[in-house]
Amino acid sequence: MSKLFWATLSFISRLPVPSRWAQGLDFEQYSRGIVMFPLIGAILGGLSGLIFILLQPWCGIPLAALFCILALALLTGGFHLDGLADTCDGIFSARRRERMLEIMRDSRLGTHGGLALIFVLLAKILVVSELALRGTPVLAALAAACAAGRGSAALLMYRHRYAREEGLGNVFIGKVSGRQTCVTLGLAAIITTVLLPGMQGLAAIVITLAAIFILGQLLKRTLGGQTGDTLGAAIELGELIFLLALL
């Protein structure tokens, strides 16, 4: 189990993990790491929140929010943001399904992808700033949001098909069992309600899961399945929806 945790951590983040800690684990086994997504999300969000706490007394709330969201992007290497941009480039191209998937595979950033990145990043900065002004503990909010965002991605894996013939997303999409999905969603709910006691955390995770489930169905109808890019988009949008639900 520890090897699976370290392998999953190195797969979905840029935190340095010694290769020997995940040695001996086949790539095909990574799908079992879905249950680690909420915990890893909480760690990444907590580190981002720590940046906010350290910088806020020195530079104020808006700049601290800017740098903590930047830190979160760096901690993941922009992995999920890239998926968000590619997904928006493909979906909003309004082309045939096959052409949409080709556009999503293109490494160049399009207009729709650029607008999506600007909107999501700016929205996160503004929402974190507003939460801080309202007295919400930012570290707990970010840790919970990242746990919820990554946990909700399981909804785009279970009983979904991979829209392409090959790619990184194929490791998870359609390979996750119902039990693993329930454990993942349950762990995300536990983490969020522990970090944000009362109805606030519970309501936010319910809203997030409902929104991402609907997103998954819309993407399935449009693309014929899911890809690694749509998983990244779901994670980024899940984080933002959770934070918005806390307002």
Swiss-Prot record:
UniProt-recorded Gene Ontology molecular function terms: adenosylcobinamide-GDP ribazoletransferase activity; cobalamin 5'-phosphate synthase activity
Q: Which GO terms describe its biological process?
A: cobalamin biosynthetic process
| Transmembrane feature ranges | 34-54, 59-79, 113-133, 138-158, 194-214
Q: What is its EC number?
A: 2.7.8.26
Query: Topology with regard to the membrane?
Result: Multi-pass membrane protein
One GO cellular component term noted in the UniProt record for this chain = plasma membrane
Known function = Joins adenosylcobinamide-GDP and alpha-ribazole to generate adenosylcobalamin (Ado-cobalamin). Also synthesizes adenosylcobalamin 5'-phosphate from adenosylcobinamide-GDP and alpha-ribazole 5'-phosphate.
State the similarity comment.
Answer: Belongs to the CobS family.
Listed name of the protein = Adenosylcobinamide-GDP ribazoletransferase
Source organism per UniProt: Salmonella arizonae (strain ATCC BAA-731 / CDC346-86 / RSK2980)
